Amino acid sequence: FMPTIRGSDVGSKKRYAGLSVDAAGNESMIYRGLEMARSDWTPLARQFQEGLLSRVFQGAPYREFIIEYAHSTLAGKKDDLLIYRKRLRHRLDAYVANVPPQVRAARIADEYNDRVGRPRQYQNGGWIQYVMTRNGPEPLESRRSRIDYEHYLAKQIKPIADSILIPLGEDFVTLTSSQQELF
């Protein structure tokens, strides 16, 4: 399976998934360049992609899986999978014009560390874990806002689903729109 490049109808030779069968008949999935293999996607996205591709390759029902996955995400049943883990490659003060979400989360974390009398952790780079909330990115250690589940559906689940569903003649919105309680 070679999903199309987003915004195009052409596949990418560096992004694919396949079902490999060895001489003994043992099956294993192979992922290259997809969200499963990338470190900048959440565990939610990786688990969803693996589950969806596995069902498609096995000829198992996948529509119910997509609907249930979206529903359980919105219901807060997958909160432990919503964590972004990103590396800060520069000092925090080096981010001026373009401030990505992980930098915003790191600044909030260090402000929190200042308030509680702990040393700052992120001024010189490092790894940050954060979630997307209704007030933007917030670090795990000081999250106060409600999780933005719609962000995870729109930015993590939908792109993966559409990259697999569109070649099959379906799409995420159509599949889930019959489930009024989702949106």
Each language-model region and where it sits:
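DNA-dependent DNA polymerase catalytic subunits
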Residues: 1-183
